């Protein structure tokens, strides 16, 4: 077949999975319309659903949060760790720096910037573990808890679906980026059955819910940075304008594809992030930042199990439901998307390399940024240089972040850099989301090909419309509720993926139960 024919075949409409695409996109558009037309009703029902889920299943979310680390550790250090996603002599498709950069910028986004500065202030106002607000202990724990919420657990949750999907792509050489194909051991044989279609639709809606949450946090952040930098008015019109700019940016990147779009944005963003972190460390209270970070390492290691399983059953103060369970739900909602994206860029790496790379480099990146950003805002609050808690109570999270950054030397320069960083961070996240959503809605997609461009652009527009609907519905709690609700059906799907992976490993490598680990590159015989 000629190159031209292959190209035409790659983008022909017949490859679109019409049932998954149209049902999913229609659902997203209808929900967006309902949130826009009936914002108060949408907010009430979303928060009721979140309260019911966290009340009845909060304990379950906390237990689920422990499983990814255990399972990923077994994969990395067990007999299957040296299995390679590719042939024996195949090199990684992307350099380690680009690979880590794409994973980090696609997964954490500018939410890390927003929460890095704001989350500690929430915790000194409403501390965990029965601690007195604004006490010395509250300040110490306010620096530790963000590291816990953004550390090993979320990256392990992202890693969990990555391995079965990469195995499916590069060992079985399945021409698909559908989650349903990685759950085949528990699904009917017929791929066009209702079960396969429903599973992919649930995944799409879960991904959209997780991404919409990030947009709900990110748009006000970028707007506040622009207000501080340019002096424009902070209102709904400005927020919608930011969404439109964003949609154009990541829609263009999604149109360009993986290597020309996402990789370029990720490379730029990693460089900018290191610049911001170095500037905070050098221009900020260096000794204080080093001391509080060292202190937090000890607190974290000494209390990790307590934080992981703390349900607050006696006092019932609501901290686990409002924070830990919310975060675990957020990461779960994002997990299928991140698993698909991480797997797609992990060709040529071993299972052990992928697991350690995702959890190790990812956790290190969030640890460094949260230690510096959180330490800096706590320094300002604790030394009466900025009443961050008052700004949080009266104006909200986004204006607080802008004001904290404005306290650094050369505020105009650093505000400009952080604004650009935030824009690209989110553009990379939603670019990846549009790419993955389009892939799920595509039939028979080989690992070396990309989904139809207009399919990708359609999802970029869909995400932008959902963001506008969520902004009109308004409210921090509404955004959080969206995450928790969308995450619940994803949990059994991830369990199905893990079961299928173990089934594949036992079937394809029976010799590993008797002999020392070997490297297997060839697809198993059918």
Task: Set out the residue ranges of the language-model regions.
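Membrane-interface loop-to-helix entry segments
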Residues: 54-57, 64, 199, 203-207, ...
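Extracellular/periplasmic helix-exit of transmembrane alpha-helices
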Residues: 115-129, 173, 280-303, 363-396
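Flexible loop linkers connecting adjacent transmembrane helices
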Residues: 2-11, 44-50, 77-96, 121-145, ...
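Loop-to-transmembrane helix boundary motifs in multi-pass membrane proteins
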Residues: 13-28, 188-197, 232-251, 255, ...
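Helix-loop-helix connectors at the membrane interface of multi-pass transporters/channels
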Residues: 2-15, 176-192, 218-242, 273-279, ...
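Helix-loop-helix module between adjacent transmembrane segments
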Residues: 11-36, 69-72, 108-112, 149-220, ...
């Amino acid at each position: 077949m000629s190159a031209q024919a292959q190209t035409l075949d790659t983008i022909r409409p017949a490859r679109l999975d019409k049932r998954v695409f149209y049902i999913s996109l229609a659902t997203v558009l209808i929900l967006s319309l309902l949130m826009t037309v009936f914002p108060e009703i949408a907010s009430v029902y979303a928060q009721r659903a979140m309260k019911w889920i966290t009340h009845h299943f909060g304990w379950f979310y906390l237990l689920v949060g422990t499983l990814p680390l255990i399972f990923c550790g077994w994969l990395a250090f067990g007999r299957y760790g040296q299995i390679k996603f590719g042939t024996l002599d195949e090199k990684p498709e992307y350099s380690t720096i680009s690979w880590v950069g794409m994973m980090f910028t696609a997964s954490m986004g500018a939410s890390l910037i927003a929460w890095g500065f704001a989350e500690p202030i929430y915790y000194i106002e409403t501390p965990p573990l029965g601690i007195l607000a604004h006490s010395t202990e509250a300040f110490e724990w306010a620096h530790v808890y963000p590291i816990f919420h953004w550390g090993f657990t979320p990256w392990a949750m992202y890693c969990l679906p990555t391995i079965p999907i990469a195995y499916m792509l590069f060992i079985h050489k399945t021409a698909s980026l559908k989650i349903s194909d990685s759950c085949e051991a528990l699904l009917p044989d017929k791929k066009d059955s209702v079960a396969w279609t429903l599973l992919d639709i649930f995944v799409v809606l879960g991904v959209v819910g997780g991404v919409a949450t990030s947009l709900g946090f990110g748009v006000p952040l970028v707007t506040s940075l622009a207000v501080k930098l340019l002096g424009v008015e902070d209102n709904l019109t400005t927020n919608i304008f930011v969404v439109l700019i964003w949609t154009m940016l990541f829609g263009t990147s999604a149109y360009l594809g993986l290597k020309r779009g996402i990789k370029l944005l990720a490379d730029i963003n990693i460089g900018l992030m290191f610049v911001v972190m170095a500037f905070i460390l050098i221009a900020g209270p260096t000794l204080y930042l080093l001391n509080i970070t060292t202190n937090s390492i000890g607190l974290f290691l000494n209390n990790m199990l307590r934080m992981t399983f703390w349900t607050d059953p006696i006092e019932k103060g609501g901290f686990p439901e409002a924070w830990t369970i919310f975060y675990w739900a957020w990461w779960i909602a994002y997990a299928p998307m991140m698993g698909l994206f991480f797997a797609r860029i992990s060709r040529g790496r071993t299972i052990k390399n992928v697991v350690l790379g995702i959890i190790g480099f990812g956790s290190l990146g969030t640890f460094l940024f949260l230690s510096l950003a959180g330490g800096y805002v706590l320094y300002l609050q604790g030394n009466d240089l900025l009443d961050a808690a008052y700004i949080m109570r009266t104006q909200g999270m986004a204006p607080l972040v802008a004001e904290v950054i404005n306290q650094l030397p050369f505020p105009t320069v650093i505000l400009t850099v952080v604004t650009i960083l935030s824009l690209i961070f989110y553009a990379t996240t939603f670019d990846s989301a549009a790419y993955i959503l389009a892939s799920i809605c595509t039939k028979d997609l080989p690992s070396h090909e990309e989904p139809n461009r207009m399919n990708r652009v359609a999802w970029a527009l869909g995400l932008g419309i959902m963001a506008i609907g969520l902004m009109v519905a308004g409210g921090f709690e509404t955004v959080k509720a969206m995450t928790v609700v969308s995450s619940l059906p994803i949990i059994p799907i991830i369990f199905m993926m893990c079961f299928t992976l173990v089934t594949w490993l036992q079937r394809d490598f029976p010799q590993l139960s008797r002999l020392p680990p070997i490297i297997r590159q060839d697809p198993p015989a059918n």
